[in-house]
Amino acid sequence: MRKVLFFAFALVASVLAFTSCKGNKIDSPIVGTWKYATDPAPDSGWWTEYTFTFGGDGMFSLLDVAHPGTEEVYDGFIWTGPYEINGDIITLHKNKMGEYSSGQTKYYDEFEPNDERMKFSLTGNKLTLTREYGTEDAWEEVYTKQ
C-alpha cells in the first residue's frame, strides 16, 4: 500500500511542479521519467531511489527516497523547477524543495534556490548524469527511462 501511495504522490508532485510555472519548451529525448537506484548498503541494507521527470515544458522534478532495506518507503526529498540544456550540459534551477515523510509532503517556505549543472549523455533508454560536474568529487549515475 505504501508503495502505491509513494508512486501516486510522485505523479501528483510532478504534475503540480509542471503546471505551477512555465519553463522553456524542450524538444529532446531527455523528456520523460528516469529512475536510478543505489546498491543496498552492505551493513544496513538501506538503498536510495532517484526519480527524475523532465517535462517538455522545461520543468523538472527530482524525487529522492530512502528505503530501509525493503521496498517500504522511509523518507525523502523532492526538488522542482525549470531546467535548460546547452550542448551536453543540463542545468537544474531548483526553486522549490519539499520533504517527503510517511506519505506526506511538506514544502519548505525558506528554501534558497540553487542551480545544479550536470553533464549528460543518452544511449537508447539509458541516461548517464555526471553529478558534481567539474569537481574532483564527480560521480556518474545511470538512469533507465520508464
Label for each model-derived stretch:
Residues 17-20:
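C-terminal motif of bacterial Sec signal peptides marking the signal peptidase cleavage site
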Residues 1-4:
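Positively charged n-region of N-terminal signal peptides that target proteins for export
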Residues 22-82, 86-146:
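Lipid interaction determinants
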Residues 8-15:
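Bacterial N-terminal signal peptides
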